Amino acid sequence: MELKNGRPGDLSGRFSREIKVYDLLDDLGIEYMTVDHRGAPAETMEACKAVDEVLGTVMCKNLFLCNRQQTVFYLLLMPADKPFKTKELSAQINSARLSFAGPEQMEQYLDIRPGAVSLMGLMNDTENHVNLLVDEDLLSEEWLGCHPCVNTSSLKLRTKDAFGPFLGAVHHTMTPVHLVGEP
């Protein structure tokens, strides 16, 4: 795996959802780096660890959640080494107990499949069905690693660009949360 500036040189055989991410970042003038791992999709946290070492970023856990009634959806970004406690997060956002949303909603709202959940999917949520929650520990990092809506490539971009110009362009806001991962 090799880290390269900007979009991959060869876009043949790539999904349109991936190319759409590069197009938006380029249009916004956001600098980013990519690494391809097409032969080894980052489907597990173990696989992501190897990619994040190449990216030089903190490994991020991206969880697609919903309330019990499946009427409110959340994308939670948090450090991978923190345990996720639904009760802790539910209390902070004043929501009924949260659970993992299904792949159908993930594809419907973010145009992403399981294993590729990413902040970049918010560009496809044009009606703002998904609320972005970000653990404050990630906000203090200089760099953020994420998928370009597929798990066969990864991006490295400045955290300030991800939560500034990118979020503004896709008409989303972020709610910082403080997670400690304790019962």
Segment roles from a protein language model:
Residues 1-183:
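Extended, low-hydrophobicity, polar/charged segments
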